[in-house]
Amino acid sequence: MQREAWAVLLVLLLAGGAVYAHATTTTEEYSRYNVGWNGTSNLAAEEVRTLHDLPPGATLLILAPDRPFTAGEVGYLRTFLDSGGRVLIADEDGNANPLLADLGSAIRVRPGNLSSLSRDHTDPGLFNVRVVGNTTLFAGIETVRVNRPATVTGGDPLLETAILSWDDTDGDGHVSGSETFRTAVVCASEGNLTVLGDPSLFVNAMLAENPEFINNLQPVLIDAAHSRTGTTNPIINAIAWVRETPAAAAGLAGLAVLPVAWHFGRKRDD
């Protein structure tokens, strides 16, 4: 009978582990809790949830921003940049443009469907761009592989497509209609502010494509308050809140100990 009880307990533990693993992962693009190809679970980075008192000289990554910045947060970023901190904004949708304007930057993200013949894949949206600017982010690197980046205007160009590139407006994978070959900038900088038109460089499937770039970026902080690295999964958010709230973690630990204490108390009374 005791052996059967242990077998049932083992099955319950395995089932519970499977349910926990399923409940604490997500398929949301760019999420730190997404272990799939389009998640960022494998990107080595420390999340920050407030822009106040960022460490001087650190590098802050704002990845695929999807939330507005308050005037106070813009002020924190200005102070951070002025103190020698580096900010890298990776955006392909143009959501970063209001922040760039508030920071007084002339850089803008122009969404589109950049494609190129400078590739070794059948997909015209997956291609190599040339390093054309001098920055520590691309030190020792000649080309970077990108995945359907947006065009970046203004600032000092850092990454540029080959001449055999075009904005594939009709999505047919070929130069047609009014489309023409041209070069396009996909990354530019102004001082310590850098804007990259391809947030997918940081997803799990792309990390191995540009290892030197990822290495040059380290160590890096991620702005978890405005980036799409979070999740809408309530279970994951609850667990994250407990981990970040010492009082809640201590309370749960106490609740976990209570049954054990009660069990040993009963044995002592018996």
State what each model feature region is.
Residues 1-270:
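Short, surface-exposed patches at the edges or C-terminal ends of soluble domains, predominantly
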